[in-house]
Amino acid sequence: TARLTYAIKTTSQSGTFDGDETITQATTGAVGKVVEWDSSNSIIYYTQERFGNYGTSSTTGGKVAFSGANVITGATTSATGTPVAAADTAVTLAGGNTLTFSDGYANPEMAADSGDIIYIENRKPISRSSDQIEDIKVIVEF
């Protein structure tokens, strides 16, 4: 299984990062949202988008990448972690994939906005009542 999230390998962390928690790096002004905290490997999986409080700097309004050995702090849990300063570190994940970190940071394993839509089915709208419950199933294959 490949991920479309950025990753930070941390050392000397305190606390546990929660999913959907905003993380910041004060020195750089980087902002992101935690997707998953892998406590066994000390890896923060996160995303950044070009929306306020989700990936853009409140000062510049631009997307700022996490970088350097600056402390990363969780907004709600106050958990902290310092990125590993090693040049290249490879971590083998539970599924067998290997994630290579450069100075504590790893890019997504898949490229965003790449790929092809192989099937679209257009249907007419169906009227629903406001108290009706629906099950939605989505199949995604890579």
Residues covered by each model-derived region:
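Interface-prone segments of viral and bacterial extracellular assemblies
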Residues: 1-142
